[in-house]
C-alpha cells in the first residue's frame, strides 16, 4: 500500500521490504503492486546496470506513473496486469525460474481511497465503483443492484467479516428495489442505519465496504493465484516478500508459506514409497511476521494493520 497525500508519498514498510528482498545488483525483480512506485524506486537504487525490475498494476493511474519511470530508467518496465498473471508475463520474457525476488504489497492504496471518483471510500462521496481497473469487471454499484440478497450477505460476512451481514444485505435489497444505488455516501447511509452495533471509532460501513472491494476486484483469488505463480517464477534462493493489510490476506499468506515449509508429505498417502525430496521444504521463512515500527505508526497511522512475511525458495 502506498500512502499518498497530495504530492507526498509514504510507502508502508519501505526500507524493511526492500531489505528483505536482499537485492543483488544484477538480479531480476518483480514489484507485483507498483502503486506510485515507492518500493520500485528503492529497488532500482540498489540495482546495477544489468539489473531488471518489472512492475505490475491494474490501476491505470499507477500505470501512467510507471510509464514515466520506465521512460527515465531503461532497467524498468511496467505492465497493466494483476500480479495473479505474473507467471504468464514472466514466461513471455523467458524468465521463469530466474527471478531473484518478488514483492507483493496488498490492498488498496491511499490515492485510490482518497480519490472520491474511484468510489472506494465511504468518507468521500463519489460514484460507487471500487474497481482497481475501471475498464474491467463489474462495479460495486452493479453488484449491489443485481446480486441476490444471499450473495450480498455472503460477501459482507466472508470478505468484510461483518457479523450483521444478513440484516445489512436485506437493507440494501429493500432500498435498491425503490432506487438503485449510484453513490458511495448513499450506500454508506443505508449500511449505517442497518448496523445495530457500531464500534467506537469505526464507521459502521467499514466492513461491508471492505467486503465489496474484495469481491469486485477478486482480491483473495488473485492473491492465491499470485502466490502460486510467484513460487514458480523464483530462482532457488529467490525471496518472496508479502505485505498484507487485513486478517483475510494474512491468513492466506501464512497458510501458503506454512504448507511449503512442510513440503508435500501431507498431500501424499501414508506408506507410499516416494523420493526423499518430496518431504523436503520448498521454502524457508525468514524471521517472524513484521509490523510497522512505532515511528512509522506515528508518521502514518494507516500502516497500523500492515503485516510483512518473507520466504526464500529452496527448491
Swiss-Prot record:
S-adenosyl-L-methionine binds at residues 37-39, 57, 83, 105, 112. This is Ribosomal RNA small subunit methyltransferase H. Keywords: Cytoplasm, Methyltransferase, rRNA processing, S-adenosyl-L-methionine, Transferase. It catalyses: cytidine(1402) in 16S rRNA + S-adenosyl-L-methionine = N(4)-methylcytidine(1402) in 16S rRNA + S-adenosyl-L-homocysteine + H(+). It is found in: Cytoplasm. Its main location: cytoplasm. It comes from Pseudomonas fluorescens (strain Pf0-1). Belongs to the methyltransferase superfamily. RsmH family. The keyword rRNA processing applies. The gene is rsmH. Its EC number is 2.1.1.199. InterPro entries: RsmH (IPR002903), SAM-dep_MeTrfase_MraW_recog (IPR023397), SAM-dependent_MTases_sf (IPR029063). Specifically methylates the N4 position of cytidine in position 1402 (C1402) of 16S rRNA. One of its GO terms (biological process) is rRNA base methylation. The keyword Transferase applies. One of its GO terms (molecular function) is rRNA (cytosine-N4-)-methyltransferase activity. It comes from the Bacteria. Transmembrane segments: none annotated. GO terms for cellular component: cytoplasm.
Amino acid at each position: 500500500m502506498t500512502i499518498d497525500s497530495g504530492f507526498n508519498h509514504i510507502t508502508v514498510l519501505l526500507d524493511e521490504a526492500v531489505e528483505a528482498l536482499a537485492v543483488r545488483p544484477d538480479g531480476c525483480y518483480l514489484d507485483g503492486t507498483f502503486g506510485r512506485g515507492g518500493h520500485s524506486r528503492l529497488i532500482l537504487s540498489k540495482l546495477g546496470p544489468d539489473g531488471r525490475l518489472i512492475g505490475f498494476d491494474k490501476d491505470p493511474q499507477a500505470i501512467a506513473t510507471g510509464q514515466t519511470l520506465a521512460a527515465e530508467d531503461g532497467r524498468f518496465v511496467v505492465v497493466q496486469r494483476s500480479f495473479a498473471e505474473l507467471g504468464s508475463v514472466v514466461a513471455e520474457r523467458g524468465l521463469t525460474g530466474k527471478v531473484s525476488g518478488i514483492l507483493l504489497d496488498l490492498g488498496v492504496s491511499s490515492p485510490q481511497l482518497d480519490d472520491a471518483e474511484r468510489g472506494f471510500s465511504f468518507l468521500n462521496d463519489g460514484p460507487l465503483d471500487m474497481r482497481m481497473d475501471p475498464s474491467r469487471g463489474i462495479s460495486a454499484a452493479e453488484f449491489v443492484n443485481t446480486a441476490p440478497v444471499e450473495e450480498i450477505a455472503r460477501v459482507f460476512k466472508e470478505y468484510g467479516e461483518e457479523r450483521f451481514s444478513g440484516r445489512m444485505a436485506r437493507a440494501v435489497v429493500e432500498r435498491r428495489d425503490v432506487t438503485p444505488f449510484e453513490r458511495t455516501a448513499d450506500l454508506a447511509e443505508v449500511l449505517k442505519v442497518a448496523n445495530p452495533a457500531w464500534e467506537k471509532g469505526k464507521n459502521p460501513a467499514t466492513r461491508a465496504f471492505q467486503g465489496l472491494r474484495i469481491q469486485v476486484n477478486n482480491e483473495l483469488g488473485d492473491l492465491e493465484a499470485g502466490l502460486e505463480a510467484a513460487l514458480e517464477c523464483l530462482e532457488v534462493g529467490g525471496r518472496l516478500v508479502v505485505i498484507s493489510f487485513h486478517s483475510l490476506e494474512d491468513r492466506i499468506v501464512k497458510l501458503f508459506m506454512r504448507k511449503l515449509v512442510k513440503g508435500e508429505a501431507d498431500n501424499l498417502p501414508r506408506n507410499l514409497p516416494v523420493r526423499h525430496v518430496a518431504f523436503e521444504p520448498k521454502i524457508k521463512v525468514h524471521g517472524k511476521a513484521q509490523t510497522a515500527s512505532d515511528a512509522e505508526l506515528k508518521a502514518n497511522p494507516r500502516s497500523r494493520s500492515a503485516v510483512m512475511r518473507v520466504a526464500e525458495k529452496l527448491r
